[in-house]
Amino acid sequence: MMKQFLDLKAKHPDAVMLFRCGDFYETYSTDAIVASEILGITLTKRANGKGKTIEMAGFPHHALDTYLPKLIRAGKRVAICDQLEDPKLTKKLVKRGITELVTPGVSINDNVLNYKENNFLAAVHFGKASCGVAFLDISTGEFLTAEGPFDYVDKLLNNFGPKEILFERGKRLMFEGNFGSKFFTFELDDWVFTESTAREKLLKHFETKNLKGFGVEHLKNGIIASGAILQYLTMTQHTQIGHITSLARIEEDKYVRLDKFTVRSLELIGSMNDGGSSLLNVIDRTISPMGARLLKRWMVFPLKDEKPINDRLNVVEYFFRQPDFKELIEEQLHLIGDLERIISKVAVGRVSPREVVQLKVALQAIEPIKQACLEADNASLNRIGEQLNLCISIRDRIAKEINNDPPLLINKGGVIKDGVNEELDELRRISYSGKDYLLQIQQRESEQTGIPSLKVAYNNVFGYYIEVRNIHKDKVPQEWIRKQTLVNAERYITQELKVYEEKILGAEDKILVLETQLYTDLVQALTEFIPQIQINANQIARLDCLLSFANVARENNYIRPVIEDNDVLDIRQGRHPVIEKQLPIGEKYIANDVMLDSASQQIIIITGPNMAGKSALLRQTALITLLAQIGSFVPAESAHIGLVDKIFTRVGASDNISVGESTFMVEMNEAADILNNVSSRSLVLFDELGRGTSTYDGISIAWAIVEYIHEHPKAKARTLFATHYHELNEMEKSFKRIKNYNVSVKEVDNKVIFLRKLERGGSEHSFGIHVAKMAGMPKSIVKRANTILKQLESDNRQQGISGKPLTEVSENRSGMQLSFFQLDDPILCQIRDEILNLDVNNLTPIEALNKLNDIKKIVRGK
């Protein structure tokens, strides 16, 4: 048996193999060590021939659904090796084979999957001019592809969040250099990533002559990535994939660009703080799992075309105006369940009887939804109603054939209703009413023969028999066959008893076989309805998301935004949707107005103290814009949203030590990406840019960036720039579309009160020492900091740092160069020259120490 294990293990050496042995799944050798650590099961040993032993750990086969998810969540690939024949029917070693390879990206196990998230498998192909990427969720059948530059593919990988990514063997450095090392990855041979192999695989699966019908024919690299995914499914024994019915192109031009920094810093999907809340947490009131998954997708793919946005908003508003309609949809949605994943299980042959019944319930619930949508005074709802398919024939067949409360597994019996199959009904009568049937035979034969003491009995030697006492044996019919003679009686068998014996002894086994066949036939019939039911699931998910928007809007007092095809962003009394939900009871969120356009107020420079609310204001502006463009109402009194095509944020950076990047370097990388991709319809948010370096460097960079955005010949991007560099307030004097604002505070008795109101004009104080005091800083440090601050402010006033030089810079912008100070100290110049003249490559450690000592003497000489 161990040789059998080793032979199978050699096919998937990187996977943990669960080896079926009787009623257990066992793991051996290094797999056993890994399994015992992850699963918390006992590690033991078993004999391995010639006095040797091998590590072993196992668990009961019925606990597979408990232990398998733990291995997958730990990032392991799991090969399930089952017995392929009944051990009772063979005297040799039981034949075994790998029936499934479960990986983080390929699973349909409910205990592995998160019902609110897609479980995407991705593949990346590195082409010559661009990069191809594909995404597949085998649990829903969604199959998507795209291609473009590395930054676009990086954005897609972060937005879709695949659980596993495939790429060509030997290209790990290229992959991690462009996309990082946070993903679970698997390398495939180079032949998988060839266009001919990929096209052949795709055309064979979709049974088409080309891929033009999917709109992906021109995406060579995307096609290669898509083909690699299908090849991987074959390798992992996932060949029943009839629910993968199309390959869709991710249309970049339809959606607002959100890079991974923006998604993270705006906390769209998850909070950056433990226990914190995200925008998704606030607006997710979806009822169905499909709706929850779609809403998450909408969050990172806002629309940028006016019509589809207004189509969504129209439905949300209709829910508002028609409470009866809303209540009906809400009630039916609770009955539908995870229609999308159930129909996928039908395709792969893993659907349970209870899930089939749930499918019937869902199709029944869709009927009133369809009717209500068709009757609604709303074009978008009418279109949804038209696309919903009741699948009446299969729905009624399920109702007719499957019990309303069947067991979870088909092998438990009791799945098929009475009256569906005559043979099954007869077998059940025999199995469930055996004694009654025997009594009927006994009574009938007694009456027909006139033998009152006749009885029917059973033994293991010749089965069922009729026993007749000797005094009545002359009354026995000729067709009875004598089987045994006793002292006082004779035992006979009849043809009827032999037939009955065969039936009753094998009835239960036959019932299971027949029920399984009838159930399999029904599931096979269901496969013909996969495309229609997938459309139903998509439309129900869409309806669920829009209903969620309506419920959130009513609960939180949101209003419908006005979507306009211009560059005006005008938000009146806007609120941060997440922060306002986290305030203590009784505390009201301070709302603010923000107006940006390309004509008079393109850039707002926001100053103010720490903790005053500058960052919240920036984020709320972006979140309100994003909510509007996914079709949601927004937290404001009014909002006119001039369509945005890109949202950029540079809000809060951290260092990336793994690739040798400091906080400031990360900040500059993000800023460079923004400036290189900005457009006239972009919304740009900068928060405290330049604080990771010296004051003068920071001011210089911040000034130059603001100036660049203002003076850009084509892209007049709407920009909010929060800063502590009060010197930037000088820019308003020389740049007509830059306006100064501050988040106001009130100072009373040497204490700061945060008013959190955005007001016109710049601020001159940061009140950082006040914040330090509030944080519990020792009093001696606070006192000393105040003393130093006063001295520095006095020195700066004397040297004119905040006066004349900045005014001169704002008036003289030649070459966008800022000169705040000169290196004119002769001692420092001498040190600089000494360092510049060093040949570092040929300097020994001793020479370096001597040179450092020389420089030290120069400084002391000063």
From Swiss-Prot:
SUPFAM superfamilies, alphabetized? DNA repair protein MutS, domain I, DNA repair protein MutS, domain II, DNA repair protein MutS, domain III, P-loop containing nucleoside triphosphate hydrolases
What are the record keywords, sorted?
Answer: ATP-binding, DNA damage, DNA repair, DNA-binding, Nucleotide-binding
HAMAP family in the record:
MutS
What protein does this entry describe? DNA mismatch repair protein MutS
Concerning InterPro entries, the annotation shows: DNA_mismatch_repair_MutS, DNA_mismatch_repair_MutS-lik_N, DNA_mismatch_repair_MutS/MSH, DNA_mismatch_repair_MutS_C, DNA_mismatch_repair_MutS_clamp, DNA_mismatch_repair_MutS_core, DNA_mismatch_repair_MutS_N, DNA_mismatch_repair_MutS_sf
Q: Does the keyword Transmembrane apply?
A: no
Q: Which organism was this protein described from?
A: Bacteroides thetaiotaomicron (strain ATCC 29148 / DSM 2079 / JCM 5827 / CCUG 10774 / NCTC 10582 / VPI-5482 / E50)
Query: Which cellular components does GO assign to this protein?
Result: cytosol
So what family is this one in?
A: Belongs to the DNA mismatch repair MutS family.
Gene3D superfamilies, per the entry: 1.10.1420.10, DNA repair protein MutS, domain I (3.40.1170.10), MutS, connector domain (3.30.420.110), P-loop containing nucleotide triphosphate hydrolases (3.40.50.300)
Biological function: This protein is involved in the repair of mismatches in DNA. It is possible that it carries out the mismatch recognition step. This protein has a weak ATPase activity.
MF GO annotations: ATP binding; ATP-dependent DNA damage sensor activity; damaged DNA binding; mismatched DNA binding
Q: Which residues bind ATP?
A: G608, P609, N610, M611, A612, G613, K614, S615
Among its keywords, does the record have DNA damage? yes
GO annotation (BP), single: mismatch repair
Recorded hits in PANTHER family, A to Z, give: DNA MISMATCH REPAIR PROTEIN MSH1, MITOCHONDRIAL, DNA MISMATCH REPAIR PROTEIN MUTS FAMILY MEMBER
